[in-house]
Amino acid sequence: MNILKKIRSHLRYFFLNFFGVDIKFVKKNIFKNIETPEYESINCLYRSQGILHIGAHRGSERYVYDWLGKEVIWIEANPTIFNELKKNLVEFKYQKAYKALLHSKKRDDVDFFLSSNDNASSSIYDFSKDFKDNKLFFQNKIRNISMINKIKLKAYTLDDLILKNSIDIKKFNHWVIDVQGAELEVLKGSIESIKLCNSITVEVSTENFYKEGSKFNDVNEFLNKFNFKVTKDPKRNHEDVIFIRNDIN
């Protein structure tokens, strides 16, 4: 997920519209044929009181969040990447990082696979056989990615992490989840916290990229039970989708 790249160049359009200058989003970049960011994605960030970002990596979106004046909680599982994340957040007073692997339940020994692409596709799941055999491609692009190492980590639920650290979760009512196939596990561990969430951006897959990993239909079915509805079904096999709680004005 690269929210920074998708949003950075379009924030000016949002604020011009907000102040009464009518600018329309084009559907495609005519040179690269890449869809522009959804208006709703920017709107969710703008309307939120604060942001909970699960699967932080190095926190590349920190500048956007800071520019919007948002408090942010970052959660990253990879110990090595987490140390770099902490350094990147030093100058951001209202952004705080926690090192934790989130799961549906507390566990002492969870496999965590480290990917070759700067750990960006690291997951509690290994890649599927179809992906390893080059039968599946992220967004139909050939990418030479593999899991190059495996470590053991302790796992926590989001609800436990919130309680343990006395986080006022109602202040962080837009969530970003980027956990490479573990979306359903993370959500199952947030039964209490999710009641105070208004909107969620989730990176989902529609195909089996990760062995035993969740897919869009799994995430959609789960969130429907908590009164969240997807704004638009995914068009590609691996992309961000936005869920908004139905009773939000």
Where are these regions (language model features)?
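Phosphate/nucleotide-binding beta-alpha loop and adjacent structural elements of enzyme active sites
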Residues: 1-249
